[in-house]
A protein has these predicted regions:
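Acidic, polar ligand-binding/catalytic clefts
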Residues: 62, 70, 75-137, 210-211
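Ligand-binding clefts/hinges and TM-proximal coupling segments of bilobed small-molecule sensing domains
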Residues: 9-10, 15, 153-168, 204-208, ...
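Bilobed "Venus flytrap"/periplasmic-binding protein-like clamshell domains
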Residues: 35, 39-42, 54-71, 102-105, ...
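Periplasmic-binding protein-like
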Residues: 39, 118-126, 197-237, 256-275
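Extracytoplasmic small-molecule ligand-binding "clamshell" domains
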Residues: 15-101
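A ligand-binding cleft/hinge motif common to bilobed small-molecule-binding domains
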Residues: 84-88, 101-110, 154-157, 183-215
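Extended ligand-binding regions for polar small-molecule ligands
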Residues: 8, 62-71, 149, 216-257
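C-terminal motif of bacterial Sec signal peptides marking the signal peptidase cleavage site
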Residues: 2-6
Length: 275
C-alpha cells in the first residue's frame, strides 16, 4: 500500500506540516514498513469492497497511517493478523508497527509508543435489553473479551470474580453474543458501534470514562523498543493533532462525539528514547 492523501474534508495546510515533519523524518524517508493488525476491527481497520469488486482495508488507522506516509516519505504494506500474533510480529521485526494500542508499564518494557492519537471508550455489546452503562451492571453476566486487550485487563482487574471468556478476535466474541452463549462483549466503544450498526438486535452501552480512565489509555502507534522511526511518527502525529487532520479522520470514520476538539492534554508523550 502506497500512501494516499489525508482524510476527506480536511482543511489543513498539508504543505507546511509536511515540511516540518520531514526534518524529524529523515531516517524514515524512503523506508518500507509493515503495518500489522486485525482487519476486522472497524472503524479502525476493516475490509471494504471497492467499485472493481476487490476488497481493500480502510478505516481510521489506515487513513492516519496513509497521511503520515505521505508527509514523511515512507511506504508500508498492511499485513492482517489477530491480536496475539500482532504483538509477536512487532516484537520480532524492527520495520513493523501497529496502531490502536494503549501503553502500560508491562508493554513499555518491550515496545515504544507514540503519543496518543485517539481517546477510546469501553463498549458493552448485548443482545437486546437495556444498554449496560456501568460496570456494576455487568454483575452476574458472562463476559467475552479479546485476549490481552485493555478491555480484557480492565474487567479482570475491576471484577476479578466475573465470568470472563477470552477469544482470539472480536468477531469470535461477537458471534458468541449473537448465538446467545455469552451475555456481553466488552469491546472498544467505536468497534461496538460498528458491530451494532451491522447486526440487528444488538444493543451498545458505553461505560463512563470516570470508571475506565485509570485502566484504558489513549490509542497509540506501537513499534519494537528502540526502533528509530517512532520519534518521527510521534512528531507527525503531534502536527496532525494540531492542524486538525486527525479530528477530520475521527469525524469521518468514528463520529464527532469522539473528536479531540482542540484539547490534546490526554494524548500524553512518546516513550521513545529522547522524547
Amino acid at each position: 500500500m502506497v500512501a494516499a492523501g489525508g482524510c476527506a474534508g480536511s482543511g489543513a495546510d498539508k504543505g507546511s506540516a509536511a515540511g516540518s515533519a520531514a526534518v524529524a523524518g529523515d531516517d524514515i524517508r524512503g523506508a518500507k514498513l509493515t503495518f500489522v493488525g486485525d482487519d476486522a476491527f472497524a472503524p479502525y481497520r476493516y475490509l471494504e469492497t471497492q467499485s472493481d469488486g476487490k476488497q481493500k482495508v480502510v478505516g481510521l488507522d489506515i487513513a492516519i497511517a496513509d497521511e503520515m506516509a505521505s508527509r514523511l516519505g515512507f511506504s508500508y504494506d498492511f499485513e492482517p493478523q489477530d491480536f496475539a500474533a500482532t504483538l509477536a510480529s512487532v516484537q520480532s521485526d524492527d520495520k513493523a508497527f501497529t496502531m490502536a494500542m494503549s501503553s502500560n508499564e508491562e508493554r513499555e518494557q518491550t515496545y515504544d509508543f507514540t503519543r496518543g492519537y485517539y481517546q477510546p471508550l469501553v463498549g458493552v455489546l448485548t443482545l437486546g435489553g437495556d444498554p449496560v452503562k456501568r460496570v456494576e451492571d455487568l454483575a452476574g453476566k458472562s463476559i467475552a473479551c479479546t485476549t490481552g486487550t485493555v478491555q480484557n485487563k480492565f474487567i479482570a482487574k475491576v471484577m476479578p470474580d466475573a465470568d470472563i471468556h477470552t477469544y482470539d478476535g472480536g468477531d469470535q466474541c461477537l458471534q458468541e453474543v449473537l448465538a446467545g452463549r455469552i451475555d456481553a462483549y466488552l469491546c472498544d466503544g467505536a468497534e461496538g458501534q460498528s458491530m451494532r450498526d451491522a447486526n440487528e438486535g444488538l444493543v451498545l452501552g458505553l461505560l463512563d470514562r470516570s470508571e475506565t480512565s485509570d485502566h484504558v489509555g489513549v490509542y497509540r502507534l506501537m513499534a519494537k523498543k528502540g526502533d528509530g522511526f517512532v520519534a518521527a511518527l510521534d512528531e507527525c502525529i503531534g502536527e496532525m493533532l494540531e492542524d486538525g487532520t486527525i479530528d477530520d479522520c475521527i469525524k469521518q470514520y468514528v463520529g464527532a462525539d469522539f473528536m479531540w476538539n482542540g484539547d490534546y492534554s490526554a494524548s500524553g508523550t512518546s516513550t521513545a528514547a529522547g522524547k
